[in-house]
Every structure is written in structure tokens, then in C-alpha cells.
Amino acid sequence: MTDPLIHTRKVMGFVRDPLPTTGALSLKSTNARADLEWLGWRNVESIPLMWALSGAGDPDVALNQLVRMYQTLESQSPQAREELDQRIRADEAFRVRLLALLGGSSAMGDHLVANTHLWELLTEEAPTRAEMFTAMLESVGATPAEVVPVDDEGEERQVANTATEDLTTPGTYRATLTGVDAERALRFTYRTLMMRLAALDLAGTYPNDARRRSQPRVEFTTVTRRLSNLADAALTAALAVAVTGVYGQKPVDARLSVMAMGKCGAQELNYISDVDVIFIAEPAHSRSTRLAAEFIRTGCSSFFEVDAALRPEGKSGALVRTLESHIAYYKRWAETWEFQALLKARPMTGDMDLGQAYLDAIGPMVWTASQRDSFVDDIQAMRRRVLENVPEELRDRELKLGRGGLRDVEFAVQLLQMVHGRYDETLRVRSTVEALQVLVDQGYIGREDGHNLIESYEFLRLLEHRLQLERVKRTHTMPKVEDRMNMRWLARASGFTGSGGQSSARAMEHHLRRVRLQIQSLHSQLFYRPLLNSVVNLSVDAMKLSQEAAKLQLGALGYQHPVRAYEHLTALASGTSRKAKIQAMLLPTLMEWLSQTADPDAGLLNYRKLSDAAYDRSWFLRMLRDEGVVGQRLMRILGTSPYTSELIIATPDFVSELGDGTTGPKLLETAPDRVCKALKATVARHDDPDRAIQAARSLRRQELARVASADLLNLLTVQEVCHSLSLVWDAVLDAALEAEIRAATADPAKPDEPLAAISVIGMGRLGGAELGYGSDADVMFVAEPAPGVDENEAIAWAISVCESMRSRLAKPSGDPPLEVDLGLRPEGRSGAVVRTIESYENYYAKWGETWEVQALLRASWVAGDRELGTRFLETIDKFRYPAGGASDAQIREVRRMKARVDNERLPRGADRNTHTKLGRGALADIEWTVQLLTMLHAHEHPELHNTSTLEVLEVVEEKGIINPLQAQTLREAWLTATAARNALVLVKGKRADQLPPPGRHLAQVAGAAGWDPDEYQEYLDHYLKVTRKSRQVVEEVFWGLDSVEARREL
């Protein structure tokens, strides 16, 4: 006889159990089968129930909680268990709500298990706002309170109280229960109402397939509005308890209005969230302050954190203020972020009329905040602080504050509201989703973009809600990817199912990744694409900003000159040409990248100039369209460095070098020495010296563009930049000298062979191969007569060649200048331009001063006749590296000269703390210190016969002449000051040594130095810290331990 509980059928000789296995039901627990049998569900009649169970977020948790409920009910009476079981079988909607709740929220399941009689509430629809008010207020026996405020003269005034006898509205009530009893009643009622809302919400993301059916999905805005209504009701009851605690049965002698802020104010509250509030009291005396404080304490003890930190002056400000005091504060003292917070303000409970008066008075100020001078800087600083508060390791898991997170959407939407809401009152709405919809409807953002963002935002909020519901705790952090169990639960509770070999968790991960990427691109979608649509030809029904709205938006996005910026956009993207259409497609993304630079105005202008310069190059726009990295790099350069921008605009073909090759950035594929060889070879093909110098300029321009671009993109170190700049100068000098010699010997009226060999000796930074962008070429010329040529005739010929080269290089052009400076030669500017080795030797032996000998420490051959240059260097070694080292008199003289430099050379009005060359602990301090150490120890250590500051520092550290910490301090300061000096040239387009004060110009320098432009204050602090430490080492090493006494002796 067949077992009636297990029907079987024979299939090809095998017996198949028609009941699903626990594995098929997604049950992992070893007790699952036994639990199902205990419930009476392990039978054919219960198959729908088992499949329903398998749809829960965590079926094992749901099963465990269900068993506990049955056990509790059975302990009460068999009939109680049977009633629940029959309702589960008969009522599909209830079944889904119950199982979705038990498998989606452990905390809510625990509440239901502890109070099993509440299960019948899950058969009902969602409580209305009025019903929630009634439930919360009835839980503490509330009735409308008598509010009779007393003014400063002691006069009583009757005011309207929106509290009602049927307990369905916000207002000022008085509770019967107080203390612990009240808190217990409030907590229970609040948790029960939340449980009902959660069950309906979770049932809406329950999986729907052939084996089970979900319930209607509850719209996100409906969920958040219900939760906000619940918070309103809960805090209205908390205020009733506070009234009794402060006043007892006496009339309330103050009007107290509670303004909801943040998500609660916008009626888009989470399940578990702080509720931000602001209090207005009339009068604001000690009792109204006590009432507000008791309200906060009761709310925090019973429901959630109630936070009044958004009030004027924050936590240090008065807890309650009069309306007049609020108005005065917002008119005079409020910061931009405080007006941004007021976007969400809403009268919540207490005196609703006073709350509305607050909104009427303060609200208009919100819509003028975007006109404040500091608005853009404030907005950027607020966003930066948000990101800084998220640890790097959590930025991809944080739903709220991380990359592509909720705050990105909220921040962007609020910015658009504040910019355009001044003139467009339809934007004066509180909730993010409603604001996004209005932005779409009014044409501020594209319809598709806007709707995609709404969906993305609501999806992130859904995940946030599910995470919070699980333990009823405030959280915004996703589980780690490797936490498969929690990822699986979250995915299932959020409505994801596995398919095609992909698990539900994987499906959720992929969708989340897409959403984050979409949100990360929202600045292009929300801010820049509408701007472009305002200047291109569109159909009348297409989304399009007005010209005035577009200019307003440009100003809010950081453009200092929005009218000009709009003109640039019009010039670039208007018209019907193919190029204009491509520009209109590209510019939203390009402008997003420009917005991350220190000077987007200049960047947009430079892009317009470059587009004009590259007009006949068909590949230009195509490359920007197809190779995103080219556009991104180009915008960083154009918005950061006028110096580099001009180089690129003059050589548009260079843009192709900003892409990637097979081994990485193309900018790094070209070795500096190969560039120099190519430069010399190209110049050598020209007999005309003017054309030769023109060719040298052109190739130098390309190399400067390459080095500066790589520098701005953080692809080269400071040493690599300086070395590359030095090599190209060497090549220009060598090629130019050869060109002049060719020209001199080609003249029929002059000798056809050179009358002298000429060598160019690099001095200063050129000699040390440490040139910056703004450095001149300090040189000396050495000549040697050709065999059989009179010395005077040879020197005169060499002088004419060298002077001709200098003047030809110095001719004005659109390129960075090519100044050759002879100021370090013997006798300075009054000395001979060219000398023989013997003449130099005689001069240094008889008349050479200490400063001239010190200058020789950096002398090296850079161009011309190498053999002659080598002999010259060997000759001067006895002067710069004397056998016994520098004399005491020379050391005293060096220190005396340095003291004069410190006291006299700093330009009038310069800041000694931030002057990169002559400032405290800056380049001059470090280089003089290194040169003094060379003079003292080079006779003992041949490794110090080196012209490079950094390489000498390495040697003095290795030899123990200074300790490693001192060497590292000087090294870091030299690199920092050199990078800052280079950045100044990149930003100003000419040589500069003084860092600007904090502000926009310093932000530009910080950006060029590799820092985030918004972090210009941190950049300045770093510079000051590094140079301060450097100065301390200079005091110890250059001046001696007793530096004050050392200088006094001078």
C-alpha cells in the first residue's frame, strides 16, 4: 500500500520523490528537513509553501524563525498554531509578507517571534499617516496640550494648536505615561509599525516565477514617505512625553516647533537613520530649552538618534532660538552648507504654524546662497570633506559616501537646485527623486539621463534599506565581496535571482558596478550635456537650457567668467557641421575633466584655441572621441598650465603623443638623448643659421611640451624633468654653435676653416644638469686657436661666433626664451666673452675671488669641442678642489656672502617663508650648504667632484659627513622647492620664485605640482613643513651648531 504522505511514481525503473530537496529549496541547515517535517510541510499539499519559503532572502533564517513562532503559539494553544498555519496556506499575500519578513530581517523576525499575536497585522495593508499618529500617541495616553506662551512682559497669549482629539495630526500633546514606561511603550509601538511597513516592502522584492508569486512592489518614494510619516508620529509622541516631563499638568508656556531636516525633512527617510532637527521657540527660555532636550532624550532612547547639530553654530550654539534669532543668524553668519541643509527643512511637529513662519522667513535666503562669492569654493570643499571622511578601503563598499554613491547624486541635485531655484520655483522641492524629476521636466537635464539616475539612486537606497533592516542598525556599507553568505542574502532580499549560471550575488554585483559607473559620470550628464544642448540646434521639444540658465550653471560649476565660457561653447559646438556635432558630443565629458583642474576658464579657452589650430587635422576630434585617455590628459594640461598649453597650441600634432602605446604612455617612449641627437641632426641640415635656429626652436618646443606634459601628468620625477630640460638645452647650444661656425666659414669674405676650437662650459643649474623650466643657460666660452692662427685673431673670431649665436638665440619668438647668460665668467659682465684655457688659469690663480671659485663647483662641458672642454675642467680642478681643501678664509667668505644674500637679495615684498629660491630652507640654502661641504671635503673624497646637488648629497651621506636624516631632509626640501619653482613657471608662463598666497592662484600651482588643486592649503602646509625642517639642517651644517654666534663673527 502506498504511503499517503509520499506519493511516488516509477520512471524507468527508478522511484522519484516529487518533493523538492532541501538543496533545491536553497536550505543549507542540516536540520532543515526535520524542521519542515515538524511544521507539517514535508508533503505534496505543502509544496507551494516550501517553494514560498525558498524565496525568502535567507530561507534557513526564515525557517528557523517560523519554527520558533509555531512553538510559541503551540505553547499557548494548539488552536493558535493551527490558525497561523491555515492562514499561511490560504492567504498567499500574507504568506509572502511573513516569509519575506522572516528571511529579510533577523531583528524584525525576533520582534514577531517575541510577540506572536502581531502576525495578524501582516494581513492588513499599510497603516496610513493618521493611523500611525494615533497608534504612537495612544501608546502613551496622549491628549492635546494647552499651550499658553508668556511673552517678555509676562502677558499670556492664546495660540492655535494643531493637535487633535482623534490623535491623527502633528502638534503639541501631553502624555499620560512618562519615564521608562513611556519609552517601553513607544519603542514597542514604533517597532511594530516598522515591522508592518518592512513586511510590505520586502514582499515587493520577493522573487516572482512559476513556483511562487511576489506581491506588488512598493515604490521607493512610498517606502520613504511612510518611514518619514512614522518618524513624524513617533517624535510627536516623544514630544508629548517631554511636555509632561517638563510641565506636568500645567499649561505649556512656550511655543516649540520642531523642524525636520535632512532625509526626514525631505520625507525620504531610511529605516534606520539619524533624524536631524532644528528647534524654534517663542519665547526661548530655560523651560523651552529643557523641553527640547527632553524631546531629544526621549527620541534617542525610544527610536533613533535625534540630532540637533544642524542648528545655528552647531553643537556649540543654543539648543533653541526664537524666530528672530534664527533670521538674524542666517542673514549674517550662516555658511553655504547651512543653506544647503535648509533645502530639506520641513515643519515636523510641535507648533506647526511657528514652523511655517520659520520656513517663510528663512526659505528665500536659500535661493540666494548661490550668489555668494564663496559659493563654488564652499561646495567643492564640502564634497572634498565628504570623500576624505571615507577610508580608502571602504570607498567601493560605501553606498552613501563612496565612489558613485548616494551622496554624489544628492550633492549634484542640490547644487542644481540652488543654482536654478533662485529663478525657477518649481525646483523648490525637498526630496532628491522629486527634484530629479522636476529637473527632467523643466529641461535642466536629459530625460533619459535623469530617469537612469533616478533608477540608480533608488537601487542604492534599496540596498541601503535591506542592509539596515537585517539587524535594524544604521549602516551604508556593503558586505565584502568574499562574504558570499551575506552577499547572497542581500541579493535575494533585494529581488535578484540567479540565472544562466550566474548566482544572485553575482548578478547584484554586476548591476551595482554599472550603477556606480553611471553615477560617477553624472557630472557630465547633469551639468555639462545640458549646457551644450543650449548652444546647439535642437528640435523644439528637446531638453535645452536657456542662455541665462546655462550661464548661471557655468558660474556655479566653477567658471569665473561664465559669459566668456558660454561664448567658447557656442563657438565650438554651434552649427551643423560634422565637427560641431562631434564637439557637442565630446564637450560634456571634456568639461567634466576640465572641472577637476584649477582653472577651467583658461582650460576651455585653450581648448578652443587648440581646436582652431587643429582645424585641418581630421584625426584630432576623432582621437579625442575614440581614445578617452587623450582627452582626459589634454584637459588636465589645458586647465592647469598656460605654459604647456601654448606649446601644444603651437604644435597641434603633439596631441597624438598623449595617447598610450604598446608599453604605456607615449610620452615616455622617447628617450631624451634620442631627442637631442635628432635635434642636432636636423639643425645640421641647414646652412642658413636663422633657419637652423628656427629648426632647433621647433624641436625644442616639442621636447618641452613632452616633458611638461609628462610632468603635469605625474609621469616623470623632478630629477627626470630637470635632466631632460638640461639635455635639450645642451643640444640647442651644441647645434646653434655648429650652425654659427658653418655660417662663418661659408662666407667667401672670411676664412673657410674655423680659426679656433670653441667649447661651451655649463655653469649653475645647467652645469649640474638641474635646469628648471624658467632657467637661463649660464655658460662660459673657452677657445683655442687653430694651428698656425694668431691668438688674438682666433679669439676675436671666436667672440664674433659666440656673440652671434647668443643674439640669434635671444631673438623674440613665441617659444620660451633662449637666454645665454655669461654673468659667471671672470670679471663678470665686464670680462671677456671668450678666453683661452691659459687666460682662465691665470685669472683664477691671480685674481679669482671666492664666489668665482665656488661657481666653478658646477662647471661642466655641455657643448662644442669636448676635448677642449675636458682640458679646461682638468685645469680648474686645482682651484675648485684644492689639495688641502678650502682655507678658513674661504669658508668665512662663503658664509659672509651667504649672510649678504639672506639680508639683501630677497626682492622687496617677498615672503621669506614661501620664496622657492631665496626663502628659508629653500634652494639657495640647500645648494650653498652642499657647495660648502664640497669645498670642505672634496680633497678627501674624489666622489665629491660632482656638479649635481642631489648626487653630492648622496655622497656626503654615504661618507658620514652628515647623518642620513639631515641628508634626507635637504633632499626632500630641494625636490619640493624645485617642483614648486617648476610649477610656478608652468602656471605663470614665465620664471617666478614666489608662491602665491592661499587662493585660486595657489590652487593652480598645487595642481601643477601634482596635488589636488582643492588641497592647496595642504600643499602649502607641506611646503612650509619641509622647508622649515631644511632650514634647521642648514643652521646645523652650514652655520655650525651655534649658528647665531657663527653669523655674529662675520
Curated annotation (Swiss-Prot):
Keyword Secreted: no
EC number: 2.7.7.89, 2.7.7.42
Residues making up the signal peptide according to the UniProt record: none
Matches recorded under Pfam families: GlnD_UR_UTase, GlnE
InterPro entries attached to this UniProt entry: GlnE, GlnE_rpt_dom, NT_sf, PII_UdlTrfase/GS_AdlTrfase
Top EC class of this enzyme: transferase
Claim: Nucleotidyltransferase is one of the keywords in the record: yes
Region of interest called Adenylyl removase, as start-end residue ranges on this chain: 1-531
GO cellular component terms, semicolon-separated: cytosol
Any one GO BP annotation for this protein: regulation of glutamine family amino acid metabolic process
GO molecular function, one term: magnesium ion binding
Reaction catalyzed: [glutamine synthetase]-O(4)-(5'-adenylyl)-L-tyrosine + phosphate = [glutamine synthetase]-L-tyrosine + ADP; [glutamine synthetase]-L-tyrosine + ATP = [glutamine synthetase]-O(4)-(5'-adenylyl)-L-tyrosine + diphosphate
Cofactor: Mg(2+)
Annotated family: Belongs to the GlnE family.
HAMAP family, A to Z: GlnE
Function: Involved in the regulation of glutamine synthetase GlnA, a key enzyme in the process to assimilate ammonia. When cellular nitrogen levels are high, the C-terminal adenylyl transferase (AT) inactivates GlnA by covalent transfer of an adenylyl group from ATP to specific tyrosine residue of GlnA, thus reducing its activity. Conversely, when nitrogen levels are low, the N-terminal adenylyl removase (AR) activates GlnA by removing the adenylyl group by phosphorolysis, increasing its activity.
Protein name, entry field: Bifunctional glutamine synthetase adenylyltransferase/adenylyl-removing enzyme
Organism for this UniProt entry: Corynebacterium efficiens (strain DSM 44549 / YS-314 / AJ 12310 / JCM 11189 / NBRC 100395)
Upper classification of the organism: Bacteria, Bacillati, Actinomycetota, Actinomycetes, Mycobacteriales
Record gene name: glnE
